[in-house]
A protein has these predicted regions:
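DUTPase catalytic domain/fold
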Residues: 1-179
Length: 179
C-alpha cells in the first residue's frame, strides 16, 4: 500500500481464550461483594485478553481483533470495532481512550475525545477516530491502539433552581484562576 503509514506490531503470543473462563461471578471478600467486570469476546478465534502495562496501570490495553485502515482527513470518522462486549458492574462505567503513544506517533484522535460506555450497554465496544496525518494508517490485528478504564460513578440528585450562590473565590470566566 503506497503512501500508507504502518504501525509496528509486536506479535502477541496468546492463544484464543475460552469464553467461559472470562465470565466471573461476584465473589465475597471479607464480607463484602467484590465487583467484577465481565469481558466476553465477540469472536473467540480473534480475541486477545486485555492487559495492563504494569501492576499499577489504571487502564487495560485492548488488542485489535482485525486489521483496520484509517484514511486521512476529518470528513468521516472511522469506526473501529474492539472485539469485546462487557458486563459492567453496577455503579461503574467504562472510558475508552487512545493509548498516548498512538496519538503521539500516528496522529490519530478520537472523534468524541473519550468514549463513555454506560453500565447497561451490552453491545460490542467500538471507537471512532480521525487521522490527522498525511497518509492512511494501517492498524494491524493485535495492535494495542485503545485502552479501557473502569470508572466509578457518583450519582447525585439534580435540582433546577432560578439562581446559584456567588460565594466563591473564582471569577466568572474560563481561565479565571490565572495563566
Amino acid at each position: 500500500m503506497e503512501g500508507a503509514l504502518f504501525m509496528r506490531v509486536k506479535k502477541v503470543e496468546q492463544e484464543p481464550q475460552d469464553t467461559n473462563s472470562l465470565i466471573e461471578e461476584k465473589t465475597e471478600v471479607k464480607g463484602k461483594t467484590k465487583n467484577t467486570l465481565k469481558i466476553c469476546p465477540v469472536n473467540p478465534e480473534r480475541f486477545y485478553t486485555p492487559t495492563k502495562g504494569t501492576e499499577k496501570a489504571t487502564c487495560y490495553d485492548v488488542y485489535l481483533p482485525k486489521d483496520v485502515i484509517v484514511p486521512r482527513g476529518l470528513q468521516n470518522p472511522t469506526q473501529i470495532a474492539l472485539g469485546i462486549k462487557m458486563e459492567i458492574p453496577k455503579g461503574y462505567d467504562i472510558r475508552i481512550h487512545l493509548r498516548s503513544s498512538v496519538a503521539r506517533d500516528y496522529h490519530l484522535i478520537m472523534a468524541n475525545s473519550v468514549g463513555i460506555v454506560d453500565e447497561d450497554f451490552r453491545g460490542e465496544l467500538t471507537a471512532y477516530v480521525y487521522n490527522l496525518g498525511n497518509y492512511p494508517i494501517f492498524l494491524k490485528e493485535q495492535q494495542r491502539v485503545f485502552q479501557i478504564e473502569l470508572h466509578k460513578k457518583d450519582n447525585v440528585d439534580v435540582e433546577f433552581v432560578s439562581d446559584i450562590s456567588e460565594d466563591t473565590e473564582r471569577g466568572h470566566e474560563s481561565g479565571s484562576t490565572g495563566r
